[in-house]
Amino acid sequence: MDEMKRINDAAEKVLAVCGQAEIGIILGSGLGDYAEALEDAVKLPYSEIPGFPRSTVAGHAGMWCCGTLHGKRVVMMQGRFHYYEGYSMKDVTLPVRVMQKIGVKTLIVTNAAGGVNMGYHPGDLMVIGDMFSLTAQNPLIGPNLDEFGPRFPDMSCAFDKELRALAHACAGEQGFALREGVYAQMTGPTYETPAEIRMLRTLGADAVGMSTVPEVIVARHGGMRVLGISCITNMAAGILDQPLNHAEVTETANRVKGHFRALLDAVVEKM
């Protein structure tokens, strides 16, 4: 199917059911409960949106949720799509294109991540200051969609400086501090080996996960302001003498969701 037709068909359905929005929030593993904060919420299963993939990962409900939060029209994704699920980068980033079509100007992207920085601890929240990917894929490969942005978009400041400062200020008002660091994306679905983590640390990564980078690339291509928040749910391989598992990821995300919710509430209110 033609890429623009796919985007337009999905956006038409979303507009008919949910209407326009100004802020988009992608909720990562174990963080989907935050969608319950929406007032006058309408939920649209991904299965009812033309051309949308399906969420297959535990902790990803597969719902497009829209409503009002602090007087602003907000759309939240309960679950995202991952390259390791067998989806293309166009599939993974389709929701961001749909957000752009329905009026979203600011994207808050969240994820569960492993701590690469030895000074981090499970339960920390990290503002993403920069990012890199070792997937050898880019969602903008192929014909440029001129309607959204230029052929060669600038990525020198992928994450909005003002929004990062706002996040730190809001956390301080809530009585806790945020980390700030570099997020690295690997393909998954395997967790990284200790050797890969040593490599990532050498490259400057503070946290690692299996998502986020393609969504941010497409968001910036379309001129969106972006704020990224990683929930450090576990220490990466080789730091602690214990195996990694998805249950630990969702358990830690559940443990810190109070801070997570307070942070997002305050940020959205002050945008």
Where are these regions (language model features)?
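Active-site/ligand-binding-proximal alpha/beta "capping" segment
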Residues: 164, 169-206, 264, 271
